[in-house]
């Protein structure tokens, strides 16, 4: 996978050679290493459960519709008029187009496989780093595909977990992502009308963790080294993150600031070797979102003579459709060819990097040692919050007793 990520193939555009990353989309899902059992399997009942929270992605084309339906029904993510009726209509209408995109990257999302690889590496390290809370077991809790967050909680309860850690896999907090996953945990218990058997705490954000920053910097430097030597210092690094509607930002969502903090630390680690910008991708609909947009930035740089670029997915830790299709195909191939880019590459996602598993283990170990329920930031609602469930969720977690 790493070797394939470093290779490039030329495209000829207007007499110029356009170099784009060569990553075989058709083999992406299969490229994730399988989760292997430990040499000496753990036979004791797990004591500490780490619930790895993320949105997930459809593994098969047949899963796309249900994925979209759950997504458009999520009122923590978006509010639509007559949502229960409109969401099924939108999901049905968009399914063929999204299925086509997934077919271009191998027929499904590899995010579950990469999460399993990361979780496996994390718990192996944790058992030696924190023997007093061992054995540790990771669980995957997705919002929009199986295993759903609620299904993971049931498995944790059935396993007799004593200490449960809700660990967001979004380094930067947003009410639309991490907040939605935490609300799902609260709703699970509220709907059943029972108190948790497990003692819950949360790792709700980690935008500047040193090992996370080191991983990003290492992946960026690897790609920079593959640009022509005479172009290398002029390469513009475009840190691309999923955008957010300005209506959410204006309520006080901390996501833009936390993404910016990650970018700043990464550039400090790189000694500010190159010019850079933070840009935003995946805007949907006509309403205002964060700007500048990734695609518009690529066009604008080309028009101004800056034609060597490195795309960095800074808010994603695993490959999924927004890296493999939107960045790799829509931007690094189609758009770059149209607007005359000379060299464009994409930094590999963190995926199976052993240092990233170490980062996850360090985050959990430090969290356990802190004996804190959550970060101070989580206790503060957005100043103009309009979602009462957020306040109920925060109260649910802050009232936990470790």
UniProtKB/Swiss-Prot annotation:
Its main location: mitochondrion. The active site is at 209, 362. It is found in: Mitochondrion inner membrane. GO terms for cellular component: mitochondrial inner membrane; mitochondrial matrix; mitochondrion. Coiled coil: none annotated. It comes from the Eukaryota. Pfam families: Ferrochelatase. Gene3D superfamilies: 3.40.50.1400. It catalyses: heme b + 2 H(+) = protoporphyrin IX + Fe(2+). Binds 1 [2Fe-2S] cluster. GO terms for biological process: heme biosynthetic process. Keywords: 2Fe-2S, Heme biosynthesis, Iron, Iron-sulfur, Lyase, Membrane, Metal-binding, Mitochondrion, Mitochondrion inner membrane, Porphyrin biosynthesis, Transit peptide. It is an enzyme of class 4 (lyase). Pathway: Porphyrin-containing compound metabolism; protoheme biosynthesis; protoheme from protoporphyrin-IX: step 1/1. GO terms for molecular function: 2 iron, 2 sulfur cluster binding; ferrochelatase activity; metal ion binding. [2Fe-2S] cluster binds at residues 175, 382, 385, 390. Its EC number is 4.98.1.1. The keyword Kinase does not apply. CDD domains: Ferrochelatase_C (cd00419), Ferrochelatase_N (cd03411). Its cofactor is [2Fe-2S] cluster. InterPro entries: Ferrochelatase, Ferrochelatase_AS, Ferrochelatase_C, Ferrochelatase_N. Residues 1-33 form a transit peptide. Catalyzes the ferrous insertion into protoporphyrin IX. Homodimer. Homotetramer. Belongs to the ferrochelatase family. This is Ferrochelatase, mitochondrial. It comes from Gallus gallus (Chicken). The lineage of its organism: Eukaryota, Metazoa, Chordata, Craniata, Vertebrata. The gene is FECH.
């Amino acid at each position: 996978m790493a070797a394939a990520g470093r290779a490039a193939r030329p495209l000829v555009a207007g007499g110029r050679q356009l170099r784009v990353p060569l990553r075989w989309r058709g083999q992406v899902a299969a490229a994730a290493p399988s989760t292997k059992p430990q040499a000496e399997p753990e036979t004791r009942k797990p004591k500490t459960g780490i619930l790895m929270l993320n949105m997930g992605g459809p593994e098969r084309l047949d899963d796309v519709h249900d994925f979209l339906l759950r997504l458009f029904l999520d009122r923590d993510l978006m509010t639509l008029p007559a949502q229960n009726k409109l969401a099924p209509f939108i999901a049905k209408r968009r399914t063929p187009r999204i299925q086509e995109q997934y077919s271009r990257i191998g027929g499904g999302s590899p995010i579950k496989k990469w999460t399993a690889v990361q979780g496996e590496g994390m718990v192996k390290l944790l058992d030696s780093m924190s023997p007093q809370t061992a054995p540790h077991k990771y669980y995957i809790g997705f919002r929009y595909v199986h295993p759903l967050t609620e299904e993971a909680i049931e498995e944790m309860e059935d396993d007799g977990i004593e200490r449960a850690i809700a660990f967001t896999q979004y380094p930067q907090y947003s009410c639309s992502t991490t907040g939605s996953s935490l609300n799902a945990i609260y709703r699970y218990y509220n709907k059943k009308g029972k108190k948790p058997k497990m003692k819950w705490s949360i790792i709700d954000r980690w935008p500047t963790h040193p090992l996370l920053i080191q991983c990003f910097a290492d992946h960026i430097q690897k790609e920079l080294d593959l640009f022509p030597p005479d172009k290398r210092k002029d390469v513009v690094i475009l840190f691309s993150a999923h955008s957010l509607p300005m209506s959410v930002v204006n309520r006080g969502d901390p996501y833009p600031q936390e993404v910016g903090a990650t970018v700043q630390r990464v550039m400090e680690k790189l000694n500010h070797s190159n010019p850079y910008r933070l840009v935003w991708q995946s805007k949907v609909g006509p309403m205002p979102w964060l700007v500048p947009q990734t695609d518009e930035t690529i066009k604008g740089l080309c028009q101004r003579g800056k034609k060597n670029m490195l795309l960095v997915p800074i808010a994603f830790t695993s490959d999924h459709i927004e890296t493999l299709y939107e960045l790799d195909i829509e931007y690094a191939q189609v758009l770059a060819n149209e607007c005359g880019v000379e060299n464009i590459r994409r930094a590999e996602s963190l995926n199976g990097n052993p240092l990233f598993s170490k980062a996850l283990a360090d985050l959990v170990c430090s969290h356990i040692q802190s004996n804190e329920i959550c970060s101070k930031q989580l206790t503060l609602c957005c100043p103009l919050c309009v979602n009462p469930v957020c306040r109920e969720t925060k109260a649910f977690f802050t009232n936990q007793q470790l």
